[in-house]
């Protein structure tokens, strides 16, 4: 995905409501398969890009693209609001504390600038919007760069390890597709 100072927003459900420390993981390498596998990318390097600013919000219970949330926390990277990202780089954000009440979503927002930024076709996985700075505000976008993992520091009863990813599950390998391939094998 190429972006010239584009601000993206995506709403994510949280596993547990309340105040927690969150961290966000990023990979600037693409491993992806689409459709029947004839279109796939293995170890494809992302481009150089800049994270100009990132913020998380209590996203509320509604998906209003142009809402101005009141509860927010700035996301930083090694103490800085901005980050230059190199091809194939992997990194975590610093921890950020946010209170997301029961039934609310975590709203991820960031402004990025650069070329070949790894992005995902979100379709019906989450509400995703982009503001290109053209005065039109946030408009729906199907292809959006987002963190690869949202981590939450909370007490757990047990740890579970899973193997596989969206491809092995057949999730979003075609538009609105959920084939659950692992269950079919």
Can you annotate each of these PLM segments?
Residues 158, 176-185:
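Phosphate-binding active sites in nucleotide-utilizing proteins
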Residues 1-163, 168-175:
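N-terminal secretory targeting modules
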């Amino acid at each position: 995905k190429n972006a010239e100072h584009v601000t993206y927003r995506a709403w994510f459900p949280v596993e547990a409501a309340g105040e927690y420390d969150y961290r966000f993981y990023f990979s600037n390498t693409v491993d992806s398969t689409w459709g029947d596998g004839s279109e796939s990318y293995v170890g494809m390097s992302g481009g150089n890009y800049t994270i100009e600013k990132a913020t998380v919000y209590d996203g509320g219970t509604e998906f209003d693209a142009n809402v101005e949330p009141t509860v927010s926390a700035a996301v930083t990277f090694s103490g800085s609001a901005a980050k230059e990202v190199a091809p194939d780089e992997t990194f975590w954000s610093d921890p950020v504390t946010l209170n997301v009440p029961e039934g609310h979503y975590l709203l991820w927002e960031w402004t990025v600038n650069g070329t070949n930024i790894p992005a995902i076709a979100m379709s019906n996985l989450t509400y995703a919007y982009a503001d290109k700075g053209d005065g039109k505000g946030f408009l729906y976008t199907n292809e959006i760069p987002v963190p690869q993992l949202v981590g939450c520091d909370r007490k757990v009863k047990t740890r579970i390890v899973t193997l596989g990813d969206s491809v092995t599950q057949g999730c979003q390998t075609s538009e609105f597709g959920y084939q659950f391939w692992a269950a079919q094998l």
